[in-house]
Amino acid sequence: MNNNLQGDAIAAAIDVLNEERVIAYPTEAVFGVGCDPDSETAVMRLLELKQRPVDKGLILIAANYEQLKPYIDDTMLTDAQRETIFSRWPGPVTFVFPAPATTPRWLTGRFDSLAVRVTDHPLVVALCQAYGKPLVSTSANLSGLPPCRTVDEVRAQFGAAFPVVPGETGGRLNPSEIRDALTGELFRQG
């Protein structure tokens, strides 16, 4: 996609996000659906769309670590833990951090933690940079169906009018690995 078309697609996506709606976009392995993490209305729309219970918690995806800092508590990280995390970011590894009390429950669910990732997908980096904050991100698929890997699959599952940022996935076969930021415990193999 040329830069003008990409810029137009990102601007259109930001308009949708500002309306507290959900968008779809390519990530490292599959298409994701996401929304404004600070909008309870938007997050509830996403959860309803996915038929996902609020208590499961969600993942935030960001252009850089600074975008994630308001949502996580990194004060307990050792230098070695920071080094491990930053050696894997940007990239397809999600880390679960302690969450401060100010992080909304619609993001953390029943947990006192939040899963976050600094993406290396260029389109998502550009989207988060233009939006100025991270996005809630979960796989683009309806309950019981496989995750979408193309724009056409997104439209087939969510409808022709669903707002999609066009682009290619990063080509990975598996969703992101998920690890505990403090202990390194593996929650999901990538």
Swiss-Prot record:
Residues 7-190 form the YrdC-like domain. The lineage of its organism: Bacteria, Pseudomonadati, Pseudomonadota, Gammaproteobacteria, Enterobacterales. It is found in: Cytoplasm. Its EC number is 2.7.7.87. It comes from Escherichia coli O1:K1 / APEC. Its main location: cytoplasm. Disulfide bonds: none annotated. It comes from the Bacteria. This is Threonylcarbamoyl-AMP synthase.
